[in-house]
């Protein structure tokens, strides 16, 4: 659910929690509240303000990913992705309006849609030979498969992702 942060910048209230490892990137809204409880509320607000400041400084319109590191000296911007981002792919199956539609709405001047999360989602990238998991994924009842149409699997190449959905309430 977006909230105004600075001029025309909207920042999502619920940030997904990300885990990196073994060339896999997971983005999950499951357990977000418990995981975020470990992060000081001031840091969350500082992160939102910093992301809004970056977007304002760039006069940016659209979806943007801003990756931050928590350091002893405070938050540090590590990466700016001025586009829809892998960390938001969970929104395809977890929100009323996903990051792709939000981006289009923003760049053509339409109001942002309802970004409220209706389901918990765990997103898993399919990297390289992970594409071989597709037959098993297709047997999963609550898995939504998103393939990128790449002809050849190579080590480290993103071939697609799967969103595993758990309906709320």
Regions found by a protein language model. Give the residues of each.
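Peripheral (often C-terminal) accessory segments that flank ATP-dependent C-N-forming ligase machineries
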Residues: 3, 9-14, 105-169
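Generic structural "secondary-structure junction" signal
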Residues: 26-28, 32, 37-42, 86, ...
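Surface-exposed beta-strand edges and their flanking turn/coil or helix-capping segments
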Residues: 10, 32-36, 45-49, 90-95, ...
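Internal nucleotide-binding/catalytic subdomain
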Residues: 1-63, 70
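Short, surface-exposed linear patches
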Residues: 18, 42-43, 91, 98-102, ...
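Active-site "cap" helix and flanking loop/linker of ATP-utilizing ligase/carboxylase catalytic domains
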Residues: 45-66, 71-72, 81-129
